[in-house]
Amino acid sequence: MKPVPLILLLATVLLSSHIPPSVCRPRDLAMFDGHGYKSQLDEVLLKAGDNAISYLIGEKILRYLQRNPRLQAGLPPQFPFEVTPLGSRGLGHLARSLPPLEEQRAPEEGNSLEEFVELTKRNDDPPISIDLTFHLLRNMIEMARIESQKEQAELNRKYLDEVGK
């Protein structure tokens, strides 16, 4: 390959691989909404930008807070509308704004911490889509490796039987 096309190909790949995904997102989604209102999910996604992990953590914390009305009383009234990407500063601010659980824990609410830990655990559901494809591929490779080991062991037994006679 000549150097000029190689340099152009390399420059194209490097330039296109460093475009942030937020450049491709629309700025205003109101034109797609018939009522002129943005849904809270769209607003959160726009604010989250490229930080999907912080969005997922924030979503889990929000679900946990919505399930426990006692904890909602200690939050500011505008809290559900102030959903922003939670980085280390955001999680620290949220942790400081929540009242300590040990002070307010009643005997019937002893499982709330366990429920929160359970929310953060990964599901045991089978993987979907591309994860399932790679999972099946790994299983097939493992089965092929085991089969080849069995065949090799059988050949080794035959060789030992021949040499032993």
Swiss-Prot record:
InterPro entries recorded: Corticotropin-releasing_fac_CS (IPR018446), CRF (IPR000187), Urocortin_CRF (IPR003620)
Alphabetized GO MF terms: hormone activity
Sorted UniProt keywords: Amidation, Cleavage on pair of basic residues, Hormone, Secreted, Signal
Residues that bear Valine amide: 163
Presence of the UniProt keyword Secreted in the record: yes
Sequence similarity: Belongs to the sauvagine/corticotropin-releasing factor/urotensin I family.
Record protein name field: UI
Species in which this protein is naturally found: Oncorhynchus mykiss (Rainbow trout)
